[in-house]
Design a protein with these regions (language model features):
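Strand-loop microenvironment adjacent to phosphate/nucleotide-handling motifs in alpha/beta enzyme folds
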Residues: 267, 272-276, 432-633
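NAD(P)-cofactor binding segment of oxidoreductase domains
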Residues: 220-234, 306-313, 356, 376-403
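Conserved Rossmann-fold NAD(P)-dependent oxidoreductase catalytic core, especially the SDR/UDP-sugar
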Residues: 245, 364, 368-371, 376-428, ...
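Signature of alpha-helical transmembrane segments in polytopic membrane proteins
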Residues: 1-141, 180-183, 205, 209, ...
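A solvent-exposed beta-alpha-beta segment
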Residues: 36-38, 130-244, 312-319, 326-329, ...
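Flexible, Lys/Arg-rich cytosolic regulatory linkers and terminal tails that connect or flank
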Residues: 192, 219-281, 397
Length: 633
């Protein structure tokens, strides 16, 4: 009968085995004690001895049941169980004295001491041996892990691990030399350089990061070092969850790209965050999108009087409205959240909303941002990105709005695709309106690159492909991109908007560009898998190069020209841009509008080339309807 079969036995049967075992231990203890005074074997067989033993055994088992010694038969033995066994053995020794005196009427002082020592050793050692066997059995079934970080959070994680049978922690690892070579909660603390030895000795397959207070740079450095060990790396939540006591095994998550690419945030300046928001009516277009929804979260924290959520998608509007109301309930916020459906191309709808609610500030995040989708649907992209922005801006002027901030993109810089060119045209519209005489609305625009976790980002695509076993598809092995976290981008947009004087083009410092193929490799390795390539044909995940998509750039730029000026904020700059006065731009816009109505793709392209957008298309016309109509018959 193997251990699995024994563990599967009914609970009452396992209790019976322990009762029988303890009766045997009582007999052994009784025999050892009596052997000190019994000289001949026939005395052992006396009725008095058997009556004394039987009485002691029955009373002791009843006592053990009463003190709960059999409640945790198959569990690991705790100090409480061992204490109960010792206490029960002491009482049993007293019972031994009483029964011996009753049935034999003579008792040596050494007898109960010997009885107690033999019984307590027999009862507790069997349970400790069981604990060792079960621990070893469960450990073989569990995944051996290393906890990186022996501080308070690492210790909390260890306690959480002990509550489940999924992981077996074999060691702590910590960068602090002061606690290396110490033992914490029965686990030794090792130097990070000893990780290869631990992996080899114990077959470690996962490393759990418990360093929530580390800086982004420190996390990146640790994660890059761990990449060499081919183990899956998981991490606990941030400090907020730690403070709230929410650390548990289920809260462990895979290393996110934010951990790989994140940087130390610059604390937002309160006066800039609140300047256009606090005690004002704020409207966000595209409120249900990646950037729009984060803007709403940040704005809510700055306590406007009203927050207007303007969104075309009913479901997206429902989702962000529900989330914000739940946040308000938790925080006790009194901000009035107003969910409004509508299109940014409907100027009358926009104007009526802005006037009805006396809007002070508009953050215009509504746009079509996916390069291939706009390339395949050129007219809709231009109508939404160019004329949608123009409608919003003109409605803002009509309603006497104070501040209008356009969320732009790095793809507007020397664009090679229609999406980028349309966003540059949107910028030109705001620049022209800002330059109008006696303009009361302060227009500005903020450019930045890719945000981590946004819809259409490579990151969730790669995560899905890795989860499905690959391959990861990449358009070009040399493609690079700038990345920023969504919260940081939203905070910088708000602060840049407060710094604008009118017609400003702000550029956010995106840090260093990232080679996407390196990012893909990191994500594979940190998932505990291996890259499959010519050098490693037996790897797990292959990276396939599919070729650049229509309008896609290898490299992205954030600035036009060399006249870049710093601002008072270390991560916000301004760029000097070519612009057209409204009298000239309006003619181009009129022709562009006519071309859209007539579905004239050739004229659309020529107009985008004629305007000072820097548009250099790398592909022919990719609009799907146009291509269908122009197929050779």
């Amino acid at each position: 009968m193997n251990l699995e079969t024994l563990l599967a036995l009914p609970r009452n049967l396992k209790k019976t085995f322990f009762v029988i075992h303890d009766i045997l231990m009582i007999f052994v203890a009784f025999w050892f004690a009596q052997s000190l005074k019994v000289q001949y074997s026939d005395e052992w067989l006396s009725i008095a001895n058997w009556l004394a033993f039987g009485s002691t055994a029955v009373l002791t088992i009843i006592l053990f049941i009463r003190i709960g010694l059999y409640r945790a038969v198959t569990r690991f033995v705790s100090i409480r169980v061992l204490t109960s066994a010792a206490f029960g053995s002491i009482i049993s020794a007293v019972l031994f004295c009483l029964t011996t005196l009753i049935f034999e009427q003579k008792l040596h002082l050494a007898l109960p001491i010997v009885y107690f020592l033999v019984l307590v050793v027999g009862v507790t050692s069997s349970r400790m041996i069981l604990r060792a066997i079960l621990t070893d059995h469960h450990r073989k079934q569990m995944t051996p892990v290393i906890i990186y970080g022996a501080g308070q959070s690492g210790r909390q994680l260890l306690e959480a691990i002990k509550q489940v049978n999924e992981y077996s922690a074999i060691a702590f690892v910590d960068d602090n030399p002061k606690i290396q070579r110490t033992v914490i909660y029965d686990l030794a603390v090792y130097n990070p350089n000893e990780i290869p030895m631990l992996i080899s000795r114990y077959g470690v397959r996962k490393i759990l990061l418990a360093i929530p207070s580390s800086t982004p740079e420190e996390r990146k450095d640790i994660i890059r070092r761990l990449e060499a060990y081919k183990c899956e790396v998981l991490t606990i939540p941030g400090m907020k969850d730690l403070v709230d006591g929410k650390i548990n095994v289920s809260s462990l998550k895979k290393i996110s790209v934010v951990d790989l690419l994140g940087r130390a945030p610059v604390a937002p300046r309160p006066e800039l965050m609140s300047a256009d928001i606090s005690d004002k009516v704020v409207m966000v277009t595209g409120a249900g999108g990646s950037i729009g929804s984060e803007l709403c979260r940040q704005i809510l924290n700055c306590r406007p009087t009203k927050l207007l959520l303007f969104e075309l998608s009913e479901f997206a509007l429902y989702s962000i409205d529900k989330e914000l109301r739940e946040t308000q309930a938790a925080q006790g916020s009194q901000v009035e959240v107003v969910p409004l459906l509508g299109s940014v191309q409907n100027k009358e709808r926009l104007s009526s909303i802005m006037k009805a609610y006396h809007v002070d500030t508009v953050y215009h995040a509504a746009a079509y941002k996916h390069v291939p989708m706009v390339e395949f649907n050129t007219i809709e992209g231009i109508q939404n990105n160019v004329f949608g922005t123009l409608c919003c801006a003109q409605a803002a002027v009509d309603a006497g709005i104070s501040t209008f901030v356009l969320i732009s993109t790095d793809k507007a810089v020397r664009p090679t695709n229609t999406m980028g060119a349309s966003k540059r045209m949107a910028e030109l519209c705001l620049q022209a309106l800002a330059a109008e005489p006696e303009q009361k609305t302060r227009f500005c625009m903020v450019r930045f690159g890719n945000v981590l976790g946004s819809s259409g980002s490579v990151v969730p695509v790669f995560e899905k492909q890795i989860a499905e076993g690959g391959p990861i598809t990449l358009t070009h092995q040399d493609i690079t991109r700038y990345f920023m976290t969504i919260p940081e981008a939203a905070q910088l947009v708000i602060q840049a908007g407060a710094m604008g004087k009118g017609g400003d083009v702000f550029v956010l410092d995106m840090g260093e560009s990232v080679k996407i193929i390196d990012l893909a490799r990191q994500m594979i390795v940190l998932s505990g898998l291996k890259v499959k390539d010519e050098q490693h044909p037996h790897g797990d995940i292959e990276i396939k190069i599919t070729g650049l998509r229509p309008g896609e750039k290898l490299y992205e730029e954030l600035l036009i020209g060399d006249e870049v000026q710093k601002t008072t904020h270390p991560r916000i700059m301004t760029a000097s841009e070519v612009m057209l006065p409204w009298t000239q731009l309006s003619d181009i816009l009129s022709e562009l509008h006519t071309a859209c109505l007539q579905s004239d793709q050739n004229s659309l392209r020529q107009l985008l080339l004629r305007a000072p957008t820097g548009f250099v298309p790398k592909d022919g016309i990719c609009d799907l309807v146009w291509q269908q109509n122009n197929k050779a018959v």
